[in-house]
C-alpha cells in the first residue's frame, strides 16, 4: 500500500470512523485513467482504447492505462479532456446549471472547470481561479481549447476574491491536493 502521512491518516480516521479500513483498501485498487468527451465539438471518433462510461458523468469514459489519447489531434482540438474518473466526481456533484454564477477556487489545470462549463451550457458566469500564475496560464489554455465561452480565468488568493466579489456566486467548487492542504 502507498505510504501516507500520519496527519492525513489521523484526519481521515476522524472523518470516516468505521469506514477507514474500506477507504485504505482503495489504495490497493488499480489506477484508473479517463477522458471526458466534449459534446460541443462532436468528435467523429474516440480513441480505440476508450472504454466504458464513467457512471457519474455522462461524457466520461475509462481509458486504457497505455492510451496515447493525449497525443491525438482531436485532444489538441478540444474534442476530449484527459481526466481521472475520480476527478470527474466533484463537478458532477456540484452540477452547475445554466445561468448560475460559479466560482472554481483552485481551478488548474481545468478539468473540473471545463466540466462545469459544459454543464452550464455556455450560460451564466464561470470564474476559474488559480492563485499560481504559471498554472493559471495552463488553465486558460485548457478553457480555450475546450471552447468554454462563459469562463473567466483569474489569478488571485481567496481573500482577494472575497473582498472584490462578496456573495457574488451561487456555488463554489473547491478541491485541493495534499500539497495545498496546509490548513
Predicted regions and their residues:
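Glycine-rich nucleotide cofactor-binding entry segment
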Residues: 1-168, 172
Amino acid at each position: 500500500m502507498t505510504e501516507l502521512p500520519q496527519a492525513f491518516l489521523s484526519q481521515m480516521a476522524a472523518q470516516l470512523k468505521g469506514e477507514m479500513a474500506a477507504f485504505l483498501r482503495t489504495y490497493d485498487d488499480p489506477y484508473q485513467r479517463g477522458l471526458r468527451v466534449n459534446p460541443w465539438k462532436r468528435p467523429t471518433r474516440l480513441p480505440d482504447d476508450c472504454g466504458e462510461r464513467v457512471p457519474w458523468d455522462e461524457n466520461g469514459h475509462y481509458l486504457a492505462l497505455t492510451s496515447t489519447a493525449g497525443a491525438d489531434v482531436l485532444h489538441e482540438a478540444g474534442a476530449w479532456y484527459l481526466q481521472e474518473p475520480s476527478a470527474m466526481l466533484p463537478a458532477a456533484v456540484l452540477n452547475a446549471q445554466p445561468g448560475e454564477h460559479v466560482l472554481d477556487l483552485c481551478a488548474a489545470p481545468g478539468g473540473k472547470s471545463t466540466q462545469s462549463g459544459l454543464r452550464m451550457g455556455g450560460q451564466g458566469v464561470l470564474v476559474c481561479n488559480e492563485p499560481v500564475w504559471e498554472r493559471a496560464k495552463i488553465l486558460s489554455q485548457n478553457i480555450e481549447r475546450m471552447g468554454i465561452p462563459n469562463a473567466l480565468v483569474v489569478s488571485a488568493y481567496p481573500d482577494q476574491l472575497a473582498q472584490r466579489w462578496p456573495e457574488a456566486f451561487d456555488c463554489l467548487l473547491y478541491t485541493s491536493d495534499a500539497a495545498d492542504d496546509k490548513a
